[in-house]
From Swiss-Prot:
Keyword Membrane: yes
Single annotated GO MF: monoatomic cation transmembrane transporter activity
Induction remark: By salt stress in roots.
Record-given protein name: Cation transporter HKT1;5
UniProt entry keywords in alphabetical sequence: Ion transport, Membrane, Sodium, Sodium transport, Stress response, Transmembrane, Transmembrane helix, Transport
Annotated membrane topology: Multi-pass membrane protein
Biological source species: Oryza sativa subsp. indica (Rice)
Keyword DNA-binding: no
Stated role: Sodium transporter that under salt stress mediates sodium exclusion in the phloem to prevent sodium transfer to young leaf blades and reproductive tissues. Contributes to salt-tolerance in cultivars indica Nona Bokra and Pokkali.
Length: 554
């Protein structure tokens, strides 16, 4: 018999630990452990796999773990030239980006939420079958494994709400007549309402999970197919990929996964700069940035509405109705309809604002020289869309005017679902008020947290300290603006970087060699470790967005 057989005490102990770990631990710690584990595993596998050729020097361990963390947190901060990785390493980085993407991790959240509801439904069912043959009454207390903890996925942060449940009949329930007698004469608690509620939540959560999984799969398959067809049809774009020794299929799946996860890694050293004269490819890649991030709630609602119309399933309509009323199953990507409309409008306005400023300031710049007006317009739109939060670039950011760079910094700092809402929905107001009244202890800890701006200021100061010698010797490359861009880019999990150029050195160094890496790729060990902390902080920023409330500045 297996040591984990369902009838053994060891299985019960394992089940209890499983429930405590997944349903009792705070989501912050669960997600932090998840990203740390994936990053460490990715580093070990990157180190074990061979580089592209034997002529390519093996990177330092710190650069490999930096790359693994960057892929897992979908930050795309480059410390190793991408073309030095072998095909197997590129596929591994693709897997890391897939596992770290927001949509994929939300599917995992739905899976565990569904498991929680299923366990709750089983725990609240009458146990007639378990005691039917013995004539014995059900036990008066429940086992530790039946104590469930609700793992909610609601904004502004994931909160654990502890709701112990029991199937035992309390003395007060018997006194008030709330108990019932079954056919064997034993008194037990009426569980029909809670069981029905758990069953309904289980059904809708499972359905939503399958919808998001289908959305995830369809977008990736469609994007992969479109890029492969484009590379085959347009010889120039295919020649660029083939000339770099990259398989067209690897390039397609890598780019689609990276763009949809909003990571921003591209398997070429130059990124998308190599394809700025191919607007068709840019237009194929661009929608995946929106589908996987800022407009994901919009297209998710459209997908559910389309499926409801095609299938006629009432459960799909119930999902939309609940979210329209401010309720739902706690899946914070499924926003109410009014908020979704304002989100789409906000995204469009921000993109247009960036497009207008970029065209006004950079239309005749060296980075766009030699391109047609249409290619320039598509390139400007591509940069505007990628500033939130993918980070793929079609020109060197160090050559862009300071005004545009500052605007990009603001865009990188904004959370993906930043929305201008001139009229507050009454259901949202009611929910916020009730939440404030019911979670006083939680709000105290929230107020004690520092605001994101405070944390970023501390990180910038720390990096200025660790890189103080380079700031003094190489002030143009190591300007404070470049450091701010790198830190905010890591926090926003974007990947924009001004890079490093030997030509910008005040004191030319004959041993300096230009590499296709980000600016942080030239930092010291302490600076890289600090930036990795920023990447983790940015990936988990939803837990601290409302920090700093204890400060009163008047």
């Amino acid at each position: 018999m297996s040591s984990l057989d369902a009838t053994t005490p060891r299985y019960d102990e394992f089940k209890r630990i499983y429930h405590l770990f997944l349903f009792h631990a705070h989501p912050f710690w669960l997600q932090l452990l998840y990203f740390l584990f994936i990053s460490l595993l990715g580093f070990l596998m990157l180190k074990a796999l061979p580089m592209k050729t034997s002529m390519v020097p093996r990177p330092m361990d710190l650069d490999l773990i930096f790359t693994s963390v960057s892929a897992t947190t979908v930050s795309s901060m480059v410390a190793v030239e991408m073309e030095s990785f072998s095909n197997s390493q590129l596929l591994l980085i693709t897997l890391l980006m897939l596992l770290g993407g927001e949509v994929f991790t939300s599917i995992l959240g739905l899976y565990f939420t569904n498991a929680k509801y299923s366990s709750k439904m089983i725990a609240t069912l009458p146990d007639d079958d378990d005691h039917g043959g013995s004539g014995k009454p059900p036990p008066a207390t429940t086992s530790p494994s039946s104590t469930l903890v609700e793992l909610e996925l609601a904004p502004p942060m994931d909160v654990v709400v502890v709701n112990p449940t029991t199937t035992a009949t309390t003395h007060d329930e018997v006194e008030l007549g709330l108990g019932r007698r079954n056919k064997r004469g034993c008194t037990c608690t009426t569980t029909h309402t809670s069981s029905s509620s758990s069953a309904s939540k289980t059904t809708t959560t499972r359905l939503l999970m399958f919808v998001v999984m289908g959305y995830h799969a369809v977008v990736h398959v469609a994007g992969y197919t479109a890029i492969v067809v484009y590379l085959s049809a347009v010889g120039g774009a295919g020649a660029v990929v083939a000339g770099k020794g990259i398989s067209a299929h690897t390039f397609a799946i890598f780019t689609v996964v990276s763009t949809f996860a909003n990571c921003g890694f591209v398997p070429t050293n130059e990124g998308m700069v190599s394809f700025r004269s191919f607007p068709g490819l840019l237009l194929l890649v661009m929608p995946h940035v929106l589908l996987g991030n800022t407009l994901f709630p919009v297209f998710l609602r459209l997908a559910i509405a389309a499926l409801e119309r095609v299938t006629g399933w009432p459960e799909l309509g119930e999902l939309l109705i609940r979210r329209r009323r401010g309720g739902g199953e706690g899946y914070h990507h499924l926003l109410p309809s009014s908020r979704t409309r304002f989100l789409a409008l906000t995204v469009a306005v921000l993109v247009v604002a960036q497009l207008a400023l970029f065209c006004a300031m950079e239309w005749g710049s060296d980075g766009l020289r030699g391109l047609t007006a249409g290619q320039k317009l598509v390139g400007a739109l591509f940069m505007a869309v990628n500033s939130r939060h993918s980070g793929e670039m079609v020109l060197d950011l160090s050559t862009v005017s300071s005004a545009v760079v500052v605007l990009y910094v603001v865009m990188m700092y904004l959370p993906p679902y930043t929305t201008f809402v001139p009229v507050q929905d009454k259901h949202q107001q009611t929910g916020a008020q009730s939440g404030q009244e019911g979670s006083s202890s939680s709000s105290i800890w929230q107020k004690l947290l520092m605001s994101p701006l405070s944390c970023l200021a501390i990180f910038i100061v720390v990096i200025c300290i660790t890189e103080r010698r380079q700031i003094a010797d190489d002030p143009i490359n190591y300007s404070v603006l470049n450091i701010v861009v790198e830190v905010i880019s890591a926090y926003g999990n974007v990947g924009f970087s001004t890079g490093y150029s030997c030509a910008r050195q005040v004191r030319p160094d004959g041993s300096c060699r230009d590499l296709w890496v980000g600016f942080s790729g030239k930092w010291s060990k302490q600076g890289k470790l600090t930036l990795m902390a920023v990447m983790f902080y940015g990936r988990l920023k939803k837990f601290s967005l409302h920090g700093g409330q204890a400060w009163k500045i008047e």
